[in-house]
Amino acid sequence: MSTSTVIRPVARSLLQLRKAGNTPPAFLLPCLQSSSTTSSCTQSTSFSTSSTHLYPRDMNRLRGVSTQRRTGPRQPLSVSNAKLPQPVLDESKRLKVKVDENHGLYEFFRHKDKALSTPAEEGSHGRPWSAEELRGKSWEDLHSLWWICCKERNRIATESYERQRLEAGYGDEDAEKRDMTVRRTQRAIKQVLTERYYSWQEAEVIAKDDPEIDFSGEGPLYTPRDFEEEFEEDVLAEAEGEAEPKPAQVTA
């Protein structure tokens, strides 16, 4: 039976070629036989021993929820039966809220009557403070100047955001120059404070060997010796003056 199953496809192919008038030579019979047998034994499905990496179910909890198709949420939501407030369209019935003209939030804007500055106003600014000028300032002056710079940078950022939102198309270059000027002033303030900190550290090392300075915390921190000696001499002189006997008064 096995021989007949192999010969039948070969004979069928030979008969078809003979009907067509083309008889193949004898040495091509093994080729015809192998092609016919392999075609009948071809594997139709793929085979793999590796495990699949696909999950048996979808882990997306929002699968099927779409705002464009208005499918709604997959779980019920709690909605109250309260009525929504209606807007007051009549301006005469609206409440007039009084706003403080000197409110602190106005400090974030350069102008109260307009949102953006003109290019001329944005470009009109002075030069930054130098470290030489700031070395003679007090701690309070440096602290105030630092927060003025912070407020100015906040104003610049607010106007830059507003220009980007409105697509004004101007003022970006002037705002960058103005911001760089403020940043240079802040850099000079940091330099002066760093110099003062290093000077304080060096003075603390020198003060440890100074007899007039006491770091123990039990008494005053600074006690000048010359003033103490002069004070002791004055006290002794006053005590000696009080101890001298007074001359006797002669009465008639």
Curated annotation (Swiss-Prot):
Subcellular location: Mitochondrion
GO cellular component, one term: mitochondrial large ribosomal subunit
Keyword field contains Cell division: no
UniProt-recorded Gene Ontology molecular function terms: structural constituent of ribosome
Xref: InterPro entries: MRP-L47_sf, Ribosomal_uL29_mit
Chief localization: mitochondrion
Region: Disordered, residue numbers: 233-252
GO biological process: mitochondrial translation
Acidic residues: bias regions: 233-242
Keywords linked to the UniProt accession: Mitochondrion, Ribonucleoprotein, Ribosomal protein, Transit peptide
Family: Belongs to the universal ribosomal protein uL29 family.
Protein name: Large ribosomal subunit protein uL29m
This protein's encoding gene: mrpl4
